Design a protein with these regions (language model features):
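C-terminal regulatory/interaction module of P-loop NTP-utilizing enzymes
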Residues: 1-97
Length: 97
């Protein structure tokens, strides 16, 4: 069986920059958000933040969507339908972006 892990933060930020043209500081913040959510076992998420979700958020930001809204739509909402969890993740992301 093959086992895949997430790229280290520096490489993941470079992926976001190369795929979307996003600014380095924003790419780094998105990677930090992704890493933080991946490590939140308390929320019991069945899915977590993939590099693809971060790329989606970066594309939205690069195309002019406000950063917080882009993270909410592309990163937070695909992870769960539970309103309390969504709000907790939005609050976390708002502090980090």
């Amino acid at each position: 069986a093959l086992s895949f892990d997430y790229p280290n933060p520096k490489i993941e930020a470079e992926i976001l920059i190369n795929e979307t043209g996003i600014q380095t500081d924003i790419a780094q913040k998105l990677v930090t958000i992704g890493t933080k959510i991946r490590n939140l076992t308390e929320l019991g998420l069945t899915e977590t933040v993939s590099t693809r979700l971060l790329i989606d958020a970066a594309k939205l930001i690069h195309n002019g969507l406000p950063k917080r809204l882009a993270v909410h739509v592309a990163v937070v909402e695909p992870l769960t339908d539970e309103q309390e969890t969504i709000q907790a993740l939005k609050d976390l992301c708002d502090l980090m972006i």
